[in-house]
């Protein structure tokens, strides 16, 4: 809302023929290593980029509003600068992938049965998983996502705790819309907070055991 209510931002959209702000989706991004000079050192900063939807269910990422970046000082809760690199034509075709918006793409695949008549080869007791002499405890936390604890083989300790600490995604392009992007997906967004719930009989086939994740 800080960006949408800024007159400079509204003027940049009007140059592109966009007047209905309800159809504009704004994505806040970490400011990266290049913070705009209008934001004081030590203040929390982000850069906001925008996308246009035809309606509330549209895939906004198909229509980026290229050239416009909003610099936001989160400490002061205000937009300090609107960067405008000029009007770039927006794709006209929609990119919705729901069944009602797409033609029939192919015949339905043949049914696949994955069975283990004698049951699975693993055992689960609480968060303890046992398989082929291996034992490991599993959990999920908001930052790292899946975490393995006390991994052992035939009673011999191998790892006390192992997890993915972070993942850095540098975009690696000179384009001003992307050159500053170097996202830390773990520490800035949280692997665990972005996990999806799985449904038995839908997401996986075979002898499946789902575990609860408490964060």
Summary of predicted features, one role per range:
Residues 4-215:
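Beta-strand/loop-rich accessory regions of lumenal/periplasmic or secreted enzymes
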């Amino acid at each position: 809302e800080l960006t949408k209510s800024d007159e400079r931002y509204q003027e940049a959209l009007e140059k592109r023929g966009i007047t209905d702000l309800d159809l504009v989706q704004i994505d806040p991004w970490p400011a990266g290593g290049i913070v705009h000079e209008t934001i004081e050192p030590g203040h929390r900063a982000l850069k906001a980029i925008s996308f246009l939807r035809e309606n509330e269910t549209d895939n906004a990422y198909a229509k980026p509003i290229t050239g416009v970046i909003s610099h936001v000082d989160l400490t002061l809760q205000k937009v300090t600068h609107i960067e405008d690199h000029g009007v770039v034509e927006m794709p006209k075709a929609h990119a919705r992938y729901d069944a009602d918006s797409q033609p029939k793409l192919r015949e339905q695949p043949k049914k696949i049965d994955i069975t283990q008549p004698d049951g699975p080869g693993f055992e689960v007791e609480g968060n303890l998983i046992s398989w082929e002499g291996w034992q490991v405890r599993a959990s999920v936390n908001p930052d790292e996502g899946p975490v393995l604890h006390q991994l052992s083989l035939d009673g011999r300790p191998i790892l006390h705790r192992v997890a993915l600490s972070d993942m850095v995604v540098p975009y690696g392009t000179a384009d001003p819309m992307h050159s500053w992007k170097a996202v830390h997906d773990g520490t800035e967004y949280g692997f665990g907070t972005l996990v999806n719930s799985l449904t038995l009989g839908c997401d996986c086939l075979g002898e499946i055991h789902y575990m609860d994740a408490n964060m």
